[in-house]
């Protein structure tokens, strides 16, 4: 790599369950019309600022895959290599998947709700195998035994960072502009690593949907601008506030 490397992070556009305020996790829901528009706009922002990715990384979930496709189309970069991995998936919300966030908060109380939703190392109760929103029979995850039954953010860090270091970093060091289209919590895990955030500080980090976040990294892959730079700062601030109010996921 030269003196700097460029990494762009993008959370998928608004999903159907974001709109309904449901815990989503590994449940494979699509984008809303608003989410599709956010994805297109994110690609337009990349093109307008000359920030053209050479390679794309995304998860195995359609809301991220669709966002990536729409963004690359808008940026005229559909032809670049695409690499998908379950390690970029959203945090698995266990037995909370499919539940209404407001109803869950009312049932279990503010303290327990916040511990499950935002703490670094407290996972929700595990999902029951074979239940409606479990993934144990999903062929995407056959080689990992159906995937986790629940996760906290610390678990996402453990599964994502080795992939980042072993697979994505070589592309950065070779001089490629890398675009990662993923999810609120998988991106929070990566931002925690990039910005060397404490376990306590990352609790308050919210990633808005559909707005590219640019990181220029030095030779040690440390950000030249801590926290990176959103390509639409005003929309990002409003979006992060909206995520904080509903819990993300």
UniProtKB/Swiss-Prot annotation:
Enzyme class: isomerase
Pathway noted in the entry: Carbohydrate degradation; glycolysis; pyruvate from D-glyceraldehyde 3-phosphate: step 3/5
Keywords, sorted A to Z: Gluconeogenesis, Glycolysis, Isomerase
Catalytic center residues: 12 (tele-phosphohistidine intermediate), 90 (proton donor/acceptor)
Biological process, per Gene Ontology: gluconeogenesis; glycolytic process
Catalytic function, reaction form: (2R)-2-phosphoglycerate = (2R)-3-phosphoglycerate
Pfam family, one: His_Phos_1
Residue stretches spanning the membrane: none
Keyword Isomerase: yes
Residues that coordinate or bind substrate: 11-18, 24-25, 63, 90-93, 101, 117-118, 184-185
Sites marked Transition state stabilizer: 183
Protein family membership: Belongs to the phosphoglycerate mutase family. BPG-dependent PGAM subfamily.
The protein's role, per its UniProt record: Catalyzes the interconversion of 2-phosphoglycerate and 3-phosphoglycerate.
Name used for this protein in its record: 2,3-bisphosphoglycerate-dependent phosphoglycerate mutase
Organism field: Mycobacterium avium (strain 104)
């Amino acid at each position: 790599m030269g003196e700097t490397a460029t990494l762009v992070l993008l959370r998928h556009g608004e999903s159907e369950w974001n709109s309904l305020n449901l815990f989503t996790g590994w449940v494979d829901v699509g984008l809303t019309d608003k989410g599709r528009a956010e994805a297109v706009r994110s690609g337009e922002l990349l093109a307008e600022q000359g920030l053209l990715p050479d390679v794309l990384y995304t998860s195995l979930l359609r809301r991220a895959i669709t966002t990536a496709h729409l963004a690359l189309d808008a940026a005229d970069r559909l032809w670049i290599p695409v690499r998908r991995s379950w390690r970029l998936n959203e945090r698995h919300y266990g037995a909370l998947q499919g539940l209404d966030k407001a109803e869950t908060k009312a049932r279990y109380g503010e303290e327990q709700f916040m511990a499950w939703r935002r703490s670094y190392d407290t996972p929700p109760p595990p999902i029951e195998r074979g239940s409606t929103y479990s993934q144990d029979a999903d062929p995407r995850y056959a080689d990992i035994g159906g995937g986790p039954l629940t996760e906290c953010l610390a678990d996402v860090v453990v599964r994502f960072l080795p992939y980042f270091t072993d697979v994505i970093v070589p592309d950065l060091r070779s001089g490629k502009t890398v675009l990662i289209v993923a999810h609120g919590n998988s991106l929070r895990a990566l931002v925690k690593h990039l910005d060397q955030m404490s376990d306590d500080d990352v609790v308050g980090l919210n990633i808005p949907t559909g707005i590219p976040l640019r990181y220029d990294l030095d030779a040690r892959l440390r950000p030249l601008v801590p926290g990176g730079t959103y390509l639409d700062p005003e929309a990002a601030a409003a979006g992060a506030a909206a995520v904080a109010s509903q819990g993300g996921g």
